[in-house]
C-alpha cells in the first residue's frame, strides 16, 4: 500500500509540474534575448551556422554503439552468477550484434567523414 501511495503521489506531482510548465511559459521575446551573445560585443558574423548532417549521423552512431558497450559493463559481476554459460553466451551474442552493426555501417559508408 505504501508503494502505491508513493507512486501515485509522484505521478500526480510530475503531471502537475508538466502541466504548469506548459500553461505558464514565458514567451516574452525581444531582440536582446534572441540575439547571440559574444562577450558583450555585437556579433561579427552569423551565429546560426548550418549544421553538418554527416557529423550528426556519426554522433548518433557513436551514441548507439556507446550505449551497447555500456550494456557490457556489468559483465564481470554477471559472471559470478549461477548460470555462467548463459551469461557468456548472451554477452557473446551482444558483441556479435555490435560487430554486425559496425560492418553494416562500414558497408553503407556511414563512417566516412568526407564523400
Curated annotation (Swiss-Prot):
Q: Which GO terms describe its biological process?
A: mitochondrial electron transport, NADH to ubiquinone
Parts of the chain that traverse the membrane: 3-23, 55-75, 86-106
EC number, UniProt record: 7.1.1.2
Domain of life per record: Eukaryota
Recorded GO cellular component terms are: mitochondrial inner membrane; NADH dehydrogenase complex
Enumerate the Gene3D superfamilies for this protein: NADH:ubiquinone/plastoquinone oxidoreductase, chain 3
Task: Name where it's found.
Answer: Mitochondrion inner membrane
Keyword annotations: Electron transport, Membrane, Mitochondrion, Mitochondrion inner membrane, NAD, Respiratory chain, Translocase, Transmembrane, Transmembrane helix, Transport, Ubiquinone
Topology in the lipid bilayer: Multi-pass membrane protein
Q: Does the entry feature the keyword Membrane, yes or no?
A: yes
Catalysed reaction per UniProt? a ubiquinone + NADH + 5 H(+)(in) = a ubiquinol + NAD(+) + 4 H(+)(out)
Q: Which InterPro entries does this entry report, sorted A to Z?
A: NADH_UbQ/plastoQ_OxRdtase_su3 (IPR000440), NDAH_ubi_oxred_su3_sf (IPR038430)
Gene Ontology MF annotations: NADH dehydrogenase (ubiquinone) activity
Indicate the family of this protein: Belongs to the complex I subunit 3 family.
According to the record's subunit comment, the protein's assembly and interactions are:
Core subunit of respiratory chain NADH dehydrogenase (Complex I) which is composed of 45 different subunits. Interacts with TMEM186. Interacts with TMEM242.
Q: What does this protein do?
A: Core subunit of the mitochondrial membrane respiratory chain NADH dehydrogenase (Complex I) which catalyzes electron transfer from NADH through the respiratory chain, using ubiquinone as an electron acceptor. Essential for the catalytic activity of complex I.
Q: What is this protein called?
A: NADH-ubiquinone oxidoreductase chain 3
- Taxonomic lineage of the native organism: Eukaryota, Metazoa, Chordata, Craniata, Vertebrata
Amino acid at each position: 500500500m505504501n508503494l502505491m501511495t508513493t507512486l501515485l503521489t509522484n505521478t500526480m506531482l510530475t503531471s502537475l509540474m508538466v502541466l504548469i510548465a506548459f500553461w505558464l511559459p514565458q514567451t516574452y521575446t525581444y531582440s536582446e534575448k534572441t540575439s547571440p551573445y559574444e562577450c558583450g560585443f555585437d556579433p561579427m558574423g552569423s551565429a546560426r551556422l548550418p549544421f553538418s548532417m554527416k557529423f550528426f549521423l556519426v554522433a548518433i552512431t557513436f551514441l548507439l554503439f556507446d550505449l551497447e558497450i555500456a550494456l557490457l559493463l556489468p559483465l564481470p559481476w554477471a559472471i559470478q552468477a549461477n548460470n555462467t554459460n548463459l551469461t557468456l553466451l548472451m554477452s557473446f551474442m551482444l558483441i556479435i550484434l555490435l560487430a554486425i552493426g559496425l560492418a553494416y555501417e562500414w558497408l553503407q559508408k556511414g563512417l566516412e567523414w568526407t564523400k
